[in-house]
């Protein structure tokens, strides 16, 4: 969801060690914090997709939240296709939800709780169906040990599920599922040798 993005950077080579020795390219996306000053939001409504983003302070100006959601409803477009296309009466769509709560204890400490969930599904006939699901949650503590030394500590959980169904022939029908789930933790330290570097 682009409304939730603060910045991003694409590494095609010379990938930093913090990404764990990836041999392919890496797209590093940083989500933004919600506004600690006022409640605000944005919404978009289109022929195929819609989105909504809300953000603002919680309880005081040290805590903020941001929530974003998107969905698509493209089935009606597939239904307009001619019968011979093979896609008429197909079904395709997705939805996702992002949420983040950030609390700044003082100038040296902040805590961020982030969650994400998405679901994609499609089929172009009644025989074969596909569905995908992603979920993640993380807790990040950022601490300034020194004006030039900052540490970031993250723990979290990731989940991915893939499901394929084929009911063309009862004798050969199948359901194939695949999933990955993992807990992780990592620490990253940033040292600025000089105020001008």
Question: What are these language model-derived features?
Answer:
Residues 23-25, 39-41, 48-52, 95-99, ...:
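Hydrophobic, lipid-facing positions within transmembrane beta-strands of outer-membrane proteins
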Residues 5, 36, 48, 58-61, ...:
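Outer-membrane beta-barrel channels and translocator barrels
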Residues 11, 55-57, 100-104, 140-144, ...:
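Transmembrane beta-barrel domains of outer membrane proteins
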Residues 11-13, 30, 44-48, 57, ...:
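Outer-membrane beta-barrel pore domains and translocons
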């Amino acid at each position: 969801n682009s409304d939730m993005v603060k910045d991003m950077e694409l590494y095609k080579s010379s990938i930093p060690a913090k990404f764990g020795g990836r041999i392919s390219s890496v797209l590093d996306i940083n989500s933004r914090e919600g506004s600690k000053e006022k409640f605000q939001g944005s919404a978009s409504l289109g022929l195929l997709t819609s989105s909504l983003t809300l953000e603002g302070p919680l309880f005081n100006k040290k805590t903020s939240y941001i929530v974003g959601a998107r969905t698509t409803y493209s089935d009606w477009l597939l239904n307009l296709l001619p019968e011979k296309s093979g896609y008429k009466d197909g079904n395709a769509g997705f939805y996702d939800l992002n949420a983040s709560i950030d609390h700044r204890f003082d100038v040296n400490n902040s805590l961020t709780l982030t969650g994400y969930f998405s679901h994609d599904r499609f089929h172009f006939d009644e025989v074969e169906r596909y569905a995908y699901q992603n979920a993640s949650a993380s807790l990040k503590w950022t601490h300034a040990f020194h004006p030039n030394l900052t540490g970031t500590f993250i723990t979290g959980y990731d989940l991915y599920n893939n499901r394929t169904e084929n009911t063309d022939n009862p004798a050969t029908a199948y359901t194939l599922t695949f999933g990955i789930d993992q807990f992780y933790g990592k620490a990253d330290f940033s040292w600025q040798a000089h105020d001008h570097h």
